[in-house]
Amino acid sequence: MIQPRTLKGFRDYLPAAMIPREQLMQTAREVFRSFGFAPIDTPTLEHLEILTGKGSDETDRQLYSFEDNGGRPVGMRFDLTVPLARFAAQHIGTLGTPFKRYHIAPVWRGEKPQEGRYREFVQCDFDTIGTTSELADIEAVCVIDALLRAIGIDAFTISINNRAILTGLLESLGLADKTTPVLRSLDKLGKIGREKTANEMVESAGVTAEQADAVLRLAECDGDAESILASLPEITGGNETAAAGIERLTQIYRGALASGVSPDRLKIDVSIARGLDYYTGVIFETTLDELPGIGSVCSGGRYDNLAGLYTKQHLPGIGASLGLDRLLAALESLGRLSGVSKPCAVFVPFFDKGHRDDYLKLASQLRDAGIGVEVYPEPKKLGQQLKYADSQGFAVAIIAGGNEWEAGAVQVKTLATKESQDVAYSHESPDALIEAIQAATS
């Protein structure tokens, strides 16, 4: 007999886990649409060269890749941004610009599983393609803020930076040709600390200890946002690339505040580098104040050159990705997920065979009123059925036996409190029952 099991880093989702996932995804859809983003989808498998064109060595190592039945090298998407760049290059003539899209779908990475990290996980992405306007950058911050608030999270921090500032500093240090390895090392600062990060820059990127120290002094620039912005020109030595990055970062920060983002939730952090090579401008990461150790739950940035791998048309982009599984793991750790394992709140026991059609009619009338109902399929003892309803997380049970049907009333039982009330009901007059159920489940 084959042992039923899942691969390491992969999971089954029971109803109690899947229901909040779907609720969170629906919340994300509503927020994205409120900003004018439209849904798309792309294939799970892409030509391997599409996926490896502008990732990083680390990303390439994590790719699930193989030859398909036709001998073609293919890979499973590791994020939704690279497929978007291919999608935009292929369809932008039809779509027009600016093109705003959201995409909620699974991605796969062969990384080491740990708390909040899996080899298969869902990303919720939103992106704007075809504009370099600072308004698109500001809007991205506003979407993240609106999304987390809609999910019900109040204590979070959106940290923003501009890669141009780091790039400009590296230019002034004579390290323009070593930007990628330096930024990749810098991206680990929060995880491995200053000393190990400096050593990695020296060993992996081939910079001097003095150059590594200059990069880290910039990354460690701290204080309130306005003081950081004021200090950056001197730290970067007046480099033009850095100056343009500082100006853009200032516009984004002040624009987000003007849009209503709370200053308590917005932070300038020039240590953020982001590991992927395709970011060119503003970058951001979002952490939960109560669980900083779980990492960023929403991150992204501007990638003005990514689509250039697939088209000669200049298609700048800006966007971010919500880590759905990591966020759900965080909400579970915080005790903010309900134990509901049923998508509907109302349970109808079926224990009088002679009134089978009455039970079905009652359930249909409630569904027509927008109330989800489950009718138990077997005429077992009432106690057994109510025990099942309790275990499944139903809010209300509607109890009706022969006496109730004859009397023209049913019993509405709130399962959490065990309280019951008799409510008038007939197939011709269901309104009182509908109102009672709505009150009990609101």
Curated annotation (Swiss-Prot):
It comes from the Bacteria. It is an enzyme of class 6 (ligase). Pfam families: HGTP_anticodon, tRNA-synt_His. InterPro entries: aa-tRNA-synth_II (IPR006195), aa-tRNA-synth_II/BPL/LPL (IPR045864), Anticodon-bd (IPR004154), Anticodon-bd_dom_sf (IPR036621), His-tRNA-ligase (IPR015807), HisRS-like_core (IPR041715), HisRS/HisZ (IPR004516), HisRS_anticodon (IPR033656). The keyword rRNA processing does not apply. GO terms for biological process: histidyl-tRNA aminoacylation. GO terms for cellular component: cytoplasm. The keyword Cytoplasm applies. CDD domains: HisRS-like_core, HisRS_anticodon. Its EC number is 6.1.1.21. It is found in: Cytoplasm. Disulfide bonds: none annotated. Keywords: Aminoacyl-tRNA synthetase, ATP-binding, Cytoplasm, Ligase, Nucleotide-binding, Protein biosynthesis. It catalyses: tRNA(His) + L-histidine + ATP = L-histidyl-tRNA(His) + AMP + diphosphate + H(+). Belongs to the class-II aminoacyl-tRNA synthetase family. PANTHER family: HISTIDINE--TRNA LIGASE, HISTIDYL-TRNA SYNTHETASE. Homodimer. This is Histidine--tRNA ligase. It comes from Rhodopirellula baltica (strain DSM 10527 / NCIMB 13988 / SH1).
